[in-house]
Amino acid sequence: MDKYAVWGNPIAQSKSPQIHQIFANQTQQQMEYVAMLGDEQDFEQQLRVFFEKGAKGCNITAPFKERAFQLADLHSERCLTAEACNTLKKLDDGRLYGDNTDGAGLVSDLQRLGWLKPEQTILILGAGGATKGVLLPLLQAKQHIVLANRTLSKAEDLAQKFAQYGQIQAVELDNIPVQSFDLIINATSSGLHGQTVQMNPEILQNATALYDMQYAKQADTPFVALCKQLGKQNVSDGFGMLVAQAAHAFHLWRGVMPEFEALLEQEWL
């Protein structure tokens, strides 16, 4: 049976084994998918042994995405621009193909929600790795991006790098123009620490829709909770993105695209 895994540290909380088992059942694919704890020191060696033993592919989560990128022999364009890899596939010739399905997952979930139309203006909060992983697919979907970060130079560097792919500008988090954004995406890690992004609430109130790339199992993320407190209706966390990026990885490995929307409706958590 073909073997797959998700590598991360920590990894016990991962929903990926459940997600991929549902996809396998849905598409009649015979495969095994497990969670593997990566070692900070020996991750590269662990991964080499994993593939030497016949594994067909794996997902990579924090904190190993950049290291997996370095290990891959070939990369997709979206993986190259992200400079991070969340999906590896072993090719027939033994080489490792690196991909990044985070942005594709985000785009798929925004389409599911009906929040992605051409020529929209999207405000993205944060200019870290999460943002870098989704910029190319958003720009390819003809979105106009405003990138806001506390350190302006970091946002400017990203905007300059991605300018060839579409319309993108950088602003300081404290100087976001007060306008009606079609969509605001929180790509900061503040929710992991139980905090919200410190910014002008008027900007959130004026937005048509708001999306948090983080997700929480039992309760709203801090960002989602804040948006709801402000009376916003079109608010979502990133659980759909998690499931959709897994669907794109599954498609890369197995050649069949599972229906991720059906999984979101199941009481499987």
Swiss-Prot record:
GO terms for cellular component: cytosol. CDD domains: NAD_bind_Shikimate_DH. The keyword Amino-acid biosynthesis applies. One of its GO terms (biological process) is shikimate metabolic process. Keywords: Amino-acid biosynthesis, Aromatic amino acid biosynthesis, NADP, Oxidoreductase. The active site is at K65 (proton acceptor). NADP(+) binds at E77, G126, A127, G128, G129, A130, N149, R150, T151, L152, S153, K154, M213, G238. Pathway: Metabolic intermediate biosynthesis; chorismate biosynthesis; chorismate from D-erythrose 4-phosphate and phosphoenolpyruvate: step 4/7. It catalyses: shikimate + NADP(+) = 3-dehydroshikimate + NADPH + H(+). Its EC number is 1.1.1.25. Pfam families: SDH_C, Shikimate_DH, Shikimate_dh_N. One of its GO terms (molecular function) is shikimate 3-dehydrogenase (NADP+) activity. Shikimate binds at S14, K15, S16, T61, N86, D102, Y215. It comes from the Bacteria. InterPro entries: Aminoacid_DH-like_N_sf, NAD(P)-bd_dom_sf, SDH_C, Shikimate_DH, Shikimate_DH-bd_N, Shikimate_DH_fam, Shikm_DH/Glu-tRNA_Rdtase. Involved in the biosynthesis of the chorismate, which leads to the biosynthesis of aromatic amino acids. Catalyzes the reversible NADPH linked reduction of 3-dehydroshikimate (DHSA) to yield shikimate (SA). Belongs to the shikimate dehydrogenase family. Homodimer. This is Shikimate dehydrogenase (NADP(+)). The gene is aroE.
